[in-house]
Amino acid sequence: MNNVEKKIKKIISKILNIKVEKILNNASFLDDLSADSLDIVELIMAIEEEFDIEISDEDAEKLNTVQKSIDYINNKNKK
């Protein structure tokens, strides 16, 4: 598990009150982790703050799984 993955899973764990070990990379925030729309907004804001980036609304809509969020941050960090 790389640093980005650890940080994102820690954020998810805190906001959704789920143990980090139970968060799978292919998990959907809505379907698998039972997040609602407010949780998603909170997750996006926490990720933006943690990684000091801004995520557009268009991009935020695409970040619907743990892995997509990890990939997004990894790609942002490469730029």
Curated annotation (Swiss-Prot):
PROSITE patterns in UniProt: CARRIER
Keyword set, alphabetical order: Cytoplasm, Fatty acid biosynthesis, Fatty acid metabolism, Lipid biosynthesis, Lipid metabolism, Phosphopantetheine, Phosphoprotein
Domain of life, per lineage: Bacteria
Carrier domain span: 1-77
Record-level Gene Ontology MF annotations: acyl binding; acyl carrier activity
Chief location category: cytoplasm
Record-level GO cellular component terms: cytoplasm
Pfam families: PP-binding
Pathway info: Lipid metabolism; fatty acid biosynthesis
Protein's cellular compartments: Cytoplasm
Entries under NCBIfam families matching the protein: acyl_carrier, PRK00982.1-2, PRK00982.1-3, PRK00982.1-4, PRK00982.1-5
Cited function: Carrier of the growing fatty acid chain in fatty acid biosynthesis.
Family: Belongs to the acyl carrier protein (ACP) family.
Protein name: Acyl carrier protein
Organism (species): Buchnera aphidicola subsp. Schizaphis graminum (strain Sg)
